[in-house]
């Protein structure tokens, strides 16, 4: 597409407006995991927190790197052996692909395929937090409520993985990277608000996030990610 039109972003560093947004997507997820851990356990400190990452490609790799730097223990699986080998260099511990969803961890971070949260995976899930970068994580809307009833805190995918689109917006608008990071780091604040409203209203976080999005689209009050999203 980029050979036919100038209206394609996020491909490589030779573009006029910049390249791969994956590191910024990962940073937003990292901020979101910290907010999730704080809400669930009372502290945003990731030291010793066990994170099971499903998929260590472009986003999962950068996320794992940040998590390890923050003191977390990272366990990961990927069908691509090259991705696995690169992740091992970071200190990631490898888990079988078929075991990653049910792995005993504090956080399950899906960063690969969509629809990974479904009837079967919810039944086998052993992490009290689901917070990752994959798109369309819920196989159907009902699975958000199923997670809530199981006591699993879910960070809605379109909120926690918004760092990439915020970066793409920066590339197009040609604004500073500092402003971009400031906007991305608001993802944690937005999730904290969603989590609190979910508790107060006894609604699943996915519904609360969608309602906040609708309010923003309609020009009503209600925080959502930051001015770039």
Functional labels for PLM-detected ranges:
Residues 1-42:
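Glycine/serine-rich phosphate-binding loop and adjoining beta1-alpha1 elements at the start
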Residues 54-57, 61-62, 68-88:
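NAD(P)-binding Rossmann-fold cofactor-contacting core
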Residues 37, 128-229:
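Adenosine-phosphate binding glycine-rich loop
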């Amino acid at each position: 597409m980029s050979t036919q039109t100038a209206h394609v972003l996020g491909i490589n560093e030779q573009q006029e407006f910049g390249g791969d947004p994956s590191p910024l997507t990962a940073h937003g997820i990292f901020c979101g995991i910290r907010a999730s851990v704080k809400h669930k356990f009372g502290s945003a400190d990731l030291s010793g927190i066990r994170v099971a990452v499903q998929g260590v490609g472009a986003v999962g790799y950068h996320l794992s790197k940040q998590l390890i730097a923050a003191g977390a223990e990272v366990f990961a699986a990927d069908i691509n052996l090259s991705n696995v080998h690169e992740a091992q260099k970071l200190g990631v511990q490898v888990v079988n692909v078929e075991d990653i969803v049910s792995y005993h961890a504090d956080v399950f971070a899906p960063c690969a395929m969509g629809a990974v949260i479904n009837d079967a995976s919810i039944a086998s899930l052993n992490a009290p937090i689901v917070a990752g970068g994959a798109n369309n994580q819920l196989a159907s809307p009902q699975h958000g409520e199923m997670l809530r009833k199981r006591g699993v805190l879910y960070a809605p995918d379109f909120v926690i993985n918004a760092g990439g689109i915020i970066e793409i917006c920066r590339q197009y608008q040609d604004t500073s990277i500092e402003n971009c990071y400031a906007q991305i780091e608001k993802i944690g604040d937005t999730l904290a608000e969603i989590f609190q409203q979910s508790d107060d209203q006894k609604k699943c976080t996915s519904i609360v996030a969608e309602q906040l999005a609708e309010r923003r689209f309609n020009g009503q009050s209600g925080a959502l990610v930051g001015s770039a999203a």
